[in-house]
Amino acid sequence: MSQASSTDTPFVIAGRTYGSRLLVGTGKYKDLDETRRAIEASGAEIVTVAVRRTNIGQNPGEPNLLDVIPPDRYTILPNTAGCYDAVEAVRTCRLARELLDGHNLVKLEVLADQKTLFPNVVETLKAAEQLVKDGFDVMVYTSDDPIIARQLAEIGCIAVMPLAGLIGSGLGICNPYNLRIILEEAKVPVLVDAGVGTASDAAIAMELGCEAVLMNTAIAHARDPVMMAEAMKHAIVAGRLAYLAGRMPRKLYASASSPLDGLID
């Protein structure tokens, strides 16, 4: 990643340019109406959906999430949440492509266990390689290991999405130093995925130089999800602007704001 300039560059995923750098999930809301209102307040244009946990057409007799997040308004990003090996993940992506009429953009996540929800990077690499061969545009959830992030980009993933903290933990940016290394080496967009708990966490991720942030629980489990969604929208914008502006250097000692020359006695 090159050093920031004061001129912004577009946020492009799979050849499409987006105005919002906030991506949101659809789980954990109390009902579909709250889901709709929070997503609208967030200003997000990309919305991720857990194919194995959400009805997007595979169950005709049940409420369809796509009725409240219509694909003509949002880019639907099907994800493989709940998959624990490469075979499951690939199968889920193929199902999503069938349900969404040939839609190739997917978010790959292969989990290691139910307690930590850490990514299983071995299975993630296997699944990513197969999905890229199958013609999918793969955005991939991964650890904050810079080597794994590099390998996923080399395989052909169009974006790498390292965790900032455990999924659903709200712990914030636990290891900014690894994220900085990933960002310095990045040849594809880097998005923080998981760990964000409040607006300041999102701003920090953007100040580090991430292209975007994906979140769900931070909004859905807030006391007022719709208000938090709006807060996150502004945090993403503020963080990006701060990154482009360039923060002042950190100093050990004070530095007076006003010059000492010409002081009135």
From Swiss-Prot:
GO terms for biological process: thiamine diphosphate biosynthetic process. Its main location: cytoplasm. This is Thiazole synthase. Homotetramer. Forms heterodimers with either ThiH or ThiS. It is found in: Cytoplasm. The active site is at K107. Its EC number is 2.8.1.10. Belongs to the ThiG family. 1-deoxy-D-xylulose 5-phosphate binds at G168, A194, G195, N216, T217. It catalyses: [ThiS sulfur-carrier protein]-C-terminal-Gly-aminoethanethioate + 2-iminoacetate + 1-deoxy-D-xylulose 5-phosphate = [ThiS sulfur-carrier protein]-C-terminal Gly-Gly + 2-[(2R,5Z)-2-carboxy-4-methylthiazol-5(2H)-ylidene]ethyl phosphate + 2 H2O + H(+). Catalyzes the rearrangement of 1-deoxy-D-xylulose 5-phosphate (DXP) to produce the thiazole phosphate moiety of thiamine. Sulfur is provided by the thiocarboxylate moiety of the carrier protein ThiS. In vitro, sulfur can be provided by H(2)S. Pathway: Cofactor biosynthesis; thiamine diphosphate biosynthesis. Keywords: Cytoplasm, Schiff base, Thiamine biosynthesis, Transferase. One of its GO terms (cellular component) is cytoplasm. InterPro entries: Aldolase_TIM, Thiazole_synthase_ThiG, ThiG. GO terms for molecular function: thiazole synthase activity. PANTHER family: THIAZOLE SYNTHASE. Gene3D superfamilies: Aldolase class I. The lineage of its organism: Bacteria, Pseudomonadati, Pseudomonadota, Gammaproteobacteria, Pseudomonadales. The gene is thiG.
